[in-house]
């Protein structure tokens, strides 16, 4: 290797420098994982070369024996991880080693809590990989050359992990990457072969690429003639000379792709470690399923559900998906075609015998084999979650708290599995009036009142707004359970999930209320009498609110509040209008239905008001109060306050 030249200084982005320092301190308690990360990256580089070489065999440069090598130098307190994989050119070095995360750093920082344990978990999900080297090293040197480039196109990258790094062009005869860790003084344990071997065996047995370490050198032994000790009369036999045995590179891992082994031969610990390899998550998975499918379409799948959600889970544009292998040859990361977007949290891999080795993302898009595998994997994940929900409610609740909002995308995206996805959903409800979303649609149906044929729900901006909605009053009075929905996605969900198990989902804020057999004859008779009594008042209110409401009705849903607004059956709900407006969509103008409570003292007072101006003022205040309760804001709050003040003053005279 020639001397480095053309040294250039670079700075990490400010957010990346912060992450680097935070990571070094937060992960210190489990620092040995740095070696797992570096070996995993080296194995990935070998996999990527194997794939590229399918179409260009010259990339092997007459060396097709792919491996990772781990070595140390006690005297200089260094540790080196080398691979003969794909390597990098200077642009790739700056892109991959100069940027800890290409996007999402602001969102990442917003989720940090200051608690070391939880922040450590989050950092693990962030996927720091290579940068974990700085946990034990005060300087890292990377020397790399991309396969196919000339020996003079090597690159050297050096950083002390303090916010900046240098790059220089070097000569590198062998392709691939060497990472040299200049260990901190108190981290010399990682310059010990036995310690390194124990870590590699612990974390990297499942990697299909051979991880090699040097054996100890055995010195030569000279020949010895037969000697008799006359004093003790003991004869020592002659011994031939033994040649020195040089240090040799030998595999220290099994180097067998874990997913190709029989399930019965794989321990839970091995499955957990393999999850960390494919996901770069530092925590254990919640669930996993390992299956070999034979028949018309043959493939092996190993699917994991994480315990914790990644910080950028709600970014639907971010690449997600499974690692794809064809006939055990790595093809690509993030093959999103095999898993629907609402299951983007699922990690793992697929190994297919029915796809071509030169498969591309474009070929995968409309491939019958892809569709069959996607269908099978989706059902497998849903079945895995269903089983967990039935078997361990507490564990499932933990899953729901992490991934529930993403799962709610399912009914809109996956029509074929809509009913099964709906069975996995959980909601808060008036059954407990708790913010905890632990009510399934099946358990709601089990508690339905005699004569009830609908699943009732309310959607609001917050749990408190949903729980205290005036639309719930008659339901609380009759003991009818209502689902309380306040997640941003809930309105979108119920627009696609209209029934479950033959029961229609019905919004309590939409259309006319018909409780059917749950209303007794006496209640219906009293309602009809009240409607006749208020017929002229309703007409007078409608005239007062001309152009602002579609209709005025005597309410059947109010018991404590004077008035409320509801959406007509065919109109957009308030929550859907807000959702569309928040993403810049044009929202059509629709008029609400205004319902009044004929038994309420305020409504009776308004009904008796003979002065037209005062009547109109009262009607406006009741209407704006109802709008405020339903939508959370008014177009002209100043006029509302002025009217309210005027009416309160009139009551003091």
Curated annotation (Swiss-Prot):
Show the segment(s) annotated as A.
1-361
Q: Name one Pfam family in it.
A: HATPase_c_3
Q: Where is this region: B?
A: 362-578
For the keyword Nucleotide-binding, the answer is yes
The UniProt keywords, alphabetically, are: ATP-binding, Chaperone, Cytoplasm, Nucleotide-binding, Stress response
Name the source's superkingdom. Bacteria
Residues of the region (C) are: 579-653
Q: Which GO terms describe its molecular function?
A: ATP binding; ATP hydrolysis activity; ATP-dependent protein folding chaperone; unfolded protein binding
Q: Where in the cell is it found?
A: Cytoplasm
UniProt key word Lyase: no
Predominant location category: cytoplasm
Q: Which SMART domains match?
A: HATPase_c
Q: Which GO terms describe its cellular component?
A: cytoplasm
Q: What does this protein do?
A: Molecular chaperone. Has ATPase activity.
- Could you describe the subunit structure of this protein? Homodimer.
Q: Which NCBIfam families match?
A: PRK05218.1
Tell me which family the UniProt entry assigns to this protein. Answer: Belongs to the heat shock protein 90 family.
Q: List the protein's name.
A: Chaperone protein HtpG
Which gene name does the record give? htpG
């Amino acid at each position: 290797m020639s001397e480095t030249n053309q040294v250039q200084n670079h700075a990490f982005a400010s957010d990346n420098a912060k992450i680097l320092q935070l990571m070094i301190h937060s992960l210190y308690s489990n620092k040995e994982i740095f070696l797992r990360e570096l070996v995993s990256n080296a194995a990935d580089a070998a996999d990527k070369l194997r794939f590229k070489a399918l179409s260009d065999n010259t990339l092997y440069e007459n060396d097709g024996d792919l491996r990772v090598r781990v070595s140390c130098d006690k005297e200089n307190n260094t540790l080196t991880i080398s691979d003969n994989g794909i390597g990098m050119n200077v642009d790739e070095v700056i892109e991959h080693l100069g940027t800890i995360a290409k996007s999402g750093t602001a969102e990442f920082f917003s989720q940090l809590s200051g608690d070391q344990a939880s922040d450590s978990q989050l950092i693990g999900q962030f996927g720091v990989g290579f940068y974990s080297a700085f946990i034990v090293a005060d300087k890292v040197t990377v020397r790399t050359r991309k396969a196919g480039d000339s020996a003079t196109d090597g690159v050297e990258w050096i950083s002390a992990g303090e916010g900046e790094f240098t790059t220089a062009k070097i000569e590198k005869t062998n392709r691939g990457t060497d990472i040299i860790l200049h260990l901190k003084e108190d981290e010399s344990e990682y310059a010990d072969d036995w310690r390194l071997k124990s870590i590699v065996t612990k974390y990297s047995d499942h990697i299909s690429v051979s991880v090699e370490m040097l054996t100890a050198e055995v010195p030569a032994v000279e020949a010895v003639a037969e000697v008799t000790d006359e004093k003790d009369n003991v004869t020592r036999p002659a011994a031939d000379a033994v040649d020195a045995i040089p240090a040799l590179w030998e595999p220290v891992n099994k180097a067998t792709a874990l997913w190709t082994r029989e399930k019965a031969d794989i321990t839970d610990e091995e499955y957990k470690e393999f999850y960390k390899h494919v996901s770069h998550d530092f925590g254990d998975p919640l669930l996993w399923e390992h299956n070999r499918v034979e028949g018309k379409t043959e493939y092996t799948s190993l699917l994991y559900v994480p315990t914790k959600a990644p910080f950028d889970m709600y970014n639907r544009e971010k690449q997600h998906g499974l690692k794809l292998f064809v006939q055990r040859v790595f093809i690509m990361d993030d093959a999103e075609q095999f898993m629907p977007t609402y299951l983007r949290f699922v990690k793992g891999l697929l190994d297919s015998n029915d796809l071509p080795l030169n498969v591309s993302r474009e070929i995968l898009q409309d491939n019958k084999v892809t569709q069959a595998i996607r269908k099978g994997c989706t059902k497998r994940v849903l079945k895995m979650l269903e089983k967990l929900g039935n078997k361990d409610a507490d564990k499932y609740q933990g899953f729901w708290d992490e991934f529930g909002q993403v799962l709610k995308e399912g009914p809109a995206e996956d029509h074929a599995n809509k009913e099964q996805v709906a069975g996995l959903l959980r909601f808060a409800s008036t059954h407990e009036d708790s913010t905890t979303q632990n009510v399934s649609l099946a358990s709601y149906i089990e508690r339905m009142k005699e004569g009830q044929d609908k699943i009732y729900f309310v959607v609001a901006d917050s749990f408190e707004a949903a729980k205290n909605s005036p639309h719930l009053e008659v339901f609380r009075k009759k003991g009818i359970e209502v689902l309380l929905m306040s997640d941003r996605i809930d309105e979108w969900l119920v627009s696609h999930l209209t029934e479950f198990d033959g029961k229609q989902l019905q919004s309590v804020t939409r259309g006319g209320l018909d409780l059917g057999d749950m209303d007794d004859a006496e209640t219906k008779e009293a309602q009809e009498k009240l409607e006749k009594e208020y017929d002229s008042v309703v007409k007078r209110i409608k005239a007062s609110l001309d152009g602002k409401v579609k209709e005025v009705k005597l309410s059947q849903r109010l018991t404590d509040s004077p008035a409320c607004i509801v959406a007509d059956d065919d109109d957009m709900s308030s929550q859907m209008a807000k959702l569309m407006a928040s993403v810049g969509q044009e929202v059509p103008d629709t008029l609400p239905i205004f319902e009044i409570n004929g038994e309420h003292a305020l409504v009776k007072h308004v009904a008796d008001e003979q002065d037209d101006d005062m009547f109109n003022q009262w009607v406006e205040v009741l209407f704006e109060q109802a709008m405020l309760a339903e939508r959370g804001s008014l177009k002209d709050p100043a006029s509302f306050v002025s009217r309210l003040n005027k009416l309160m003053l009139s009551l003091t005279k």
